[in-house]
């Protein structure tokens, strides 16, 4: 700053920029006066006071956007600027040009005027106010960049930030890779479920969540040692924000790390309750299971050598939820049909309950993969191609019984099989109770089928000979 003497004996404070411009020789200014272009009333380096914040920039930077408010204020060729010369613009006590706007947000406006690019910090909380500043300075391109970031309810949407575009693009590419991997894992062809339709999407995303707490015990007298209870001051939650909000919901305190994107990670959330078992129940209901835990004692200072400081520790529990595939109702219905067909095939191939042990052994021997390769191929074709965590298989896969050392008689096996088939057919025929007349007719038919031979062999048992003598045969 410098003092400029006036004719009345007073003095005026000038900025450094004007002091530099006024230090030029009078001959040079006189030589420039008769030229076709008059010198600009504004210095090359302009000092601005925007809402109490001082900014120093070039005059050409303020004129970089022709139709803006700043260009009309500092351009002498424009109609508005021609009427408003340098002396007519408001100044502060140190003769700097004063603009009554938000001084903190003007830095982003000035940064945009330099290179026509918007670079905001991550999770910028005042995008709506910056939009108002851009509208005031009539920066149409900046307004277009900021407009998608503000919703109709005047709530901030972090996904539209230009500074976060790289994160969104990387996240979108990772999601695309996950979807491609899931699509590649689904088998295709006639054996695939769903007939080549759209596979299930991963609704519940996998991830880790860590619960940490510093626990101690309540201090009581020595004669009440059995009355020491666990005391948990706060349960910390670390992991992805989307998973933490999904599991704990409103019981999650986000005051230490607000305005964070769901796909980001945090280690500053904590729960509003202090019951570990309640947190475990919520994690279990959400499909998480504990994979690791660790604990360590916390050292106390010498002047804090108390029981609650000695018996204190820090513990962490790490929970994980594996990826799960959501199956559509149509695909689930087809899976059930497929399971029924598989169950029927396995039961028909391994039904030995009604037969004896020898028949079961002979059946397993006769149906080995070596003797009947077609049945083995058919059984393997019915087995499901993929196993999901949503619905476990109803029955274990069929295991082939190794053949015995000695082959049993195949005739016995055939007779037992034929008898079992006849009994099954007879049971199916007699499905309802017969009437009295039908029972009598059946008895007469059975009696007529009895055939008494005319001649008995001489070789007979004692009871047989007694019966023949009794009836005189």
From Swiss-Prot:
Residues 347-388 have a biased composition (Polar residues). Residues 1-36, 326-409 are annotated as: Disordered. GO terms for molecular function: identical protein binding. InterPro entries: BTB/POZ_dom, H1_KCTD8, SKP1/BTB/POZ_sf, T1-type_BTB. The modification Omega-N-methylarginine is found at residue 80. GO terms for biological process: protein homooligomerization; regulation of G protein-coupled receptor signaling pathway. Its main location: membrane. The modification Phosphoserine is found at residues 78, 410. Gene3D superfamilies: Potassium Channel Kv1.1, Chain A. Keywords: Cell membrane, Cell projection, Membrane, Methylation, Phosphoprotein, Postsynaptic cell membrane, Synapse. SUPFAM superfamilies: POZ domain. Residues 44-122 form the BTB domain. It holds the Pfam family H1_KCTD8_12_16. GO terms for cellular component: cell projection; postsynaptic membrane; presynaptic active zone membrane; receptor complex. Transmembrane segments: none annotated. It is found in: Presynaptic cell membrane; Postsynaptic cell membrane. The keyword Cell membrane applies. Residues 21-35 have a biased composition (Low complexity). Signal peptide: none annotated. Residues 330-346 have a biased composition (Basic and acidic residues). Interacts as a tetramer with GABRB1 and GABRB2. PANTHER family: BTB_POZ DOMAIN-CONTAINING PROTEIN KCTD8, POTASSIUM CHANNEL TETRAMERIZATION DOMAIN-CONTAINING. Auxiliary subunit of GABA-B receptors that determine the pharmacology and kinetics of the receptor response. Increases agonist potency and markedly alter the G-protein signaling of the receptors by accelerating onset and promoting desensitization. This is BTB/POZ domain-containing protein KCTD8. It comes from Homo sapiens (Human). The gene is KCTD8.
